[in-house]
């Protein structure tokens, strides 16, 4: 992401007034719509040319995925419950399914909101590609970068128009809600990104909530 942002600066597209915005999805793993996520999984496999994965037909994959995502049970106060929304936290399959679900979600969002011929970067599945879509925000967007459910973008319009776009994105899916941070200095994952008079500055970012649980570097 840093290299792409530096390239964006070198192309003269970062101005002194360019805003940075980061947002993430609230409780993505536990808010995945189960049936829709399974539909997206099959769509993803078909779109990438898979009829089988390691010899397993995609119909069988859906059946197995259905068991994994829908047969999560847990006990609370001497009662048993079955999870009907989302998947198990910490499950490798939930992570994969969430990433694929976001692949579809972002496609829909991009088609509605992003400009023509702009860079659209995805780190979650290690893919960089171009989209030819609505020119509504062609002078406003620089690029968007996503890692699973954490998204970074640049914005060259007003802060009000950015809030308007994000509010629209928040209404795009009932289960997907965005928490945003906007400014010329914003954290993204483990990087603090700053726009200092049209120059990109970065440094390591430590989440304050995580500090008490991180072992110091020189510790044994």
Enumerate the predicted regions with their spans.
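Charged structural interfaces that engage phosphate-rich ligands
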Residues: 1-220
């Amino acid at each position: 992401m840093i290299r792409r942002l530096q390239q964006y600066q070198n192309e003269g597209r970062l101005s002194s007034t360019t805003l940075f915005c980061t947002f993430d999805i609230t409780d993505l793993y536990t808010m995945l719509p189960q049936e829709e996520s399974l539909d997206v999984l099959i769509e993803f496999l078909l779109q990438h040319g898979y009829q089988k994965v390691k010899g397993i037909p995609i119909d069988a994959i859906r059946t197995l995925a259905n068991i994994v995502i829908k047969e999560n049970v847990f006990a609370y106060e001497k009662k048993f419950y079955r999870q009907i929304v989302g998947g198990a936290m910490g499950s490798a399959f939930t992570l994969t399914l969430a990433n694929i679900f976001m692949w579809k979600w972002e496609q829909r969002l991009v088609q509605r909101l992003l400009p023509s011929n702009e860079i659209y970067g995805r780190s979650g599945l290690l893919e960089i590609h171009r989209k030819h879509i609505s020119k509504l925000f062609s002078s406003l967007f620089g690029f968007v970068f996503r890692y699973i459910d954490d998204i970074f973008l640049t914005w060259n319009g007003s802060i009000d128009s950015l809030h308007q776009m994000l509010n629209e994105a928040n209404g795009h899916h009932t289960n997907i809600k965005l928490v945003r941070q906007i400014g010329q200095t914003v954290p993204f994952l483990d990087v603090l990104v700053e726009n200092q008079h049209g120059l990109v500055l970065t440094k390591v970012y430590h989440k304050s909530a995580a500090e008490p649980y991180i072992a110091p570097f020189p510790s044994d």
